[in-house]
Amino acid sequence: MAKKVVALIKLALPAGKANPAPPVGPALGQHGVNIMAFCKEYNAKTADKPGMIIPVEISVFEDRSFTFILKTPPASVLIRKAAGVEKGSSEPNKNKVASITREQLREIAQTKLPDLNANDIDAAMNIIEGTARNMGITVNS
């Protein structure tokens, strides 16, 4: 028989740098999960993506075991990295902070496609382009 899920925890952690300090410790500790086991597993699986924020969905079972699914980094992080800026514009409709090319947009959309509610790459590109526009980053064709 399948194990019963008692909690679903969503966290966004830096790749390869999860430690028992907040936010990881309190979130997992209240469900009785072995925090160090999670940190070691997460860091091992994300060691090849340094500097990225990787969202993770942790399923905790009633016997205190857990499984987790790694998601793709947030679109805003990928866009900022491609544009080479620290943060987006505070007034995106007035001042633009950077620009990215169509190829960079396609690359980001390709990366995000499994997590987006889109059927093809063009729909994914439109979603990512909207995110970029809201950050004050223009897309050059």
Swiss-Prot record:
This is Large ribosomal subunit protein uL11. Belongs to the universal ribosomal protein uL11 family. One or more lysine residues are methylated. PROSITE patterns: RIBOSOMAL_L11 (PS00359). Pfam families: Ribosomal_L11 (PF00298), Ribosomal_L11_N (PF03946). The keyword Ribosomal protein applies. GO terms for molecular function: large ribosomal subunit rRNA binding; structural constituent of ribosome. NCBIfam families: L11_bact (TIGR01632). It comes from the Bacteria. Transmembrane segments: none annotated. Disulfide bonds: none annotated. HAMAP family: Ribosomal_uL11. One of its GO terms (biological process) is translation. GO terms for cellular component: cytosolic large ribosomal subunit. Forms part of the ribosomal stalk which helps the ribosome interact with GTP-bound translation factors. InterPro entries: Ribosomal_uL11, Ribosomal_uL11_bac-typ, Ribosomal_uL11_C, Ribosomal_uL11_C_sf, Ribosomal_uL11_CS, Ribosomal_uL11_N, Ribosomal_uL11_N_sf. Part of the ribosomal stalk of the 50S ribosomal subunit. Interacts with L10 and the large rRNA to form the base of the stalk. L10 forms an elongated spine to which L12 dimers bind in a sequential fashion forming a multimeric L10(L12)X complex. Keywords: Methylation, Ribonucleoprotein, Ribosomal protein, RNA-binding, rRNA-binding.
